[in-house]
């Protein structure tokens, strides 16, 4: 049986109204399972939606996302309703990629396995788990933390903070005033 990934909506603040009536943007939570997961998140050409493509079936909670044409590995989510993304990739060798035009903050947490995690265009938090990870903040003032394993951390343009893990990591800040802690 194919495992599905749960897409859940988490409110930024406790709102006394049902989600369907909420005027405040929410954070979109994406949680991976123990298998190898792949997520690609992009802003659509018209800028009105986020397109999420996965290597496994996606289940959706709430009413801000829907499957286009009943494709279980793809979602479209209303962009103005989303204040940020939080991705917990789970176990396995995972790949999480946000395109650089994503204008909202992104938090990505890698699990066990050799992960490739790419932030978007805003100020992002990228955290590696156990394994030899590739962690990229890309644009914005990013905070990147390596975990156990030989990680490569790259901040990209912006004032980034990079902190290596307990093993021999490679850190590269990119253009900007960066803080590198091996």
Question: At which residue positions do the language-model features occur?
Answer:
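Glycine-centered beta-turn/loop sites at beta-strand termini
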Residues: 32, 88-89, 98, 108-110, ...
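Short hydrophobic transmembrane-like helices used for membrane targeting/insertion
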Residues: 17, 126-127, 144
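Short cationic/low-complexity microdomains
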Residues: 71, 152-170
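Generic detector of solvent-exposed, compositionally biased contiguous segments
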Residues: 76-80, 120, 129
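Secretory targeting and sorting signals
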Residues: 1-22
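Extracellular lectin-like interaction modules
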Residues: 22-102, 106, 115
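Intrinsic low-complexity/IDR segments
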Residues: 18, 179-181
């Amino acid at each position: 049986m194919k495992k599905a990934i749960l897409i859940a909506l988490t409110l930024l603040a406790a709102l006394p109204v049902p989600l369907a009536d909420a005027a405040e943007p929410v954070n979109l939570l994406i949680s991976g399972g123990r298998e190898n997961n792949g997520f690609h998140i992009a802003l659509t050409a018209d800028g009105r939606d986020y397109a999420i493509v996965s290597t496994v079936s996606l289940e959706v909670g709430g009413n801000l996302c829907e499957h286009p044409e009943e494709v279980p590995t793809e979602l479209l989510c209303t962009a103005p309703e989303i204040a940020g993304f939080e991705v917990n990739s789970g176990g396995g060798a995972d790949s999480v990629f946000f395109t650089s035009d994503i204008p909202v903050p992104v938090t990505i947490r890698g699990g066990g396995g050799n992960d490739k995690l790419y932030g978007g265009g805003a100020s992002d938090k990228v955290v590696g788990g156990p394994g030899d990870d590739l962690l990229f903040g890309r644009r914005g003032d990013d905070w990147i933390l390596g975990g156990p394993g030989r990680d490569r951390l790259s901040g990209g343009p912006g004032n980034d903070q990079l902190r290596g893990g307990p093993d021999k990591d490679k850190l590269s800040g990119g253009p900007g005033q960066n803080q590198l802690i091996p």
